[in-house]
A protein has these predicted regions:
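Active-site residues of response regulator receiver
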Residues: 7, 51-54
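Helix N-cap/capping motif at the beta->alpha junctions
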Residues: 31-40, 62
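Two-component/phosphorelay signaling modules centered on CheY-like receiver
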Residues: 10-30
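Short amphipathic alpha-helix used as the core "switch/output" element in two-component signaling
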Residues: 40-41, 63-74
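Interdomain helical linkers/hinges and coiled-coil/dimerization scaffolds
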Residues: 94, 106-143
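Receiver (REC) domain active-site loop signature in two-component systems and cognate sites
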Residues: 57
Length: 143
């Protein structure tokens, strides 16, 4: 599984990477310093399972990025993290189908729980996709 971390602050990306390693999540980590670079990454690589993005960034904010991801890569699971605690931002995150909204500074235990949930969701989606493909193959054999 692959996660794309998007934040214009390198220390934030390093902190998230540290937590991923600390909890031994089996994730390949890719990074982007802003939404525009992340969008280009998503266009180039089809193997991103999780998009973890900040909201406020130069060139393209995280909500615009999440909207792009949902429209063009509907299987990607989106998590928004931000220092904005206003309800309006959380509402906008829901509108782009984010599965969670984490506040900065990241609470370590909350991050762990969210990531465990999202990784389980990724595994479940992959199983469903494999089952669907197997059923299609079996269906073709019957015809």
């Amino acid at each position: 599984m692959k996660i794309l971390l998007v934040d214009d602050e390198r220390t934030e990306r390093e902190g998230i990477r540290f937590l991923i390693e600390k909890f031994q999540f089996e994730l390949e980590v890719a990074e982007a310093a802003n939404g525009k670079l992340a969008m280009e990454y998503l266009q180039k690589y089809q193997d991103v399972d999780i998009l973890l993005t900040d909201v406020k960034m130069p060139y393209m904010d995280g909500l615009q990025l999440a909207k792009y991801a949902k429209e063009n890569r509907p299987d990607v699971i989106i998590i928004i993290f931000s220092s904005y605690s206003e309800f309006d931002y959380a509402k906008k995150a829901c509108e782009v189908s984010a599965v969670n909204y984490l506040l900065k500074p990241i609470e370590v235990e909350e991050f762990k729980q969210v990531m465990e949930h999202v990784i389980a969701l990724c595994r479940q989606k992959k199983q469903w996709k494999e089952q669907k493909e197997n059923l299609l193959v079996a269906d073709k054999k019957l015809l």
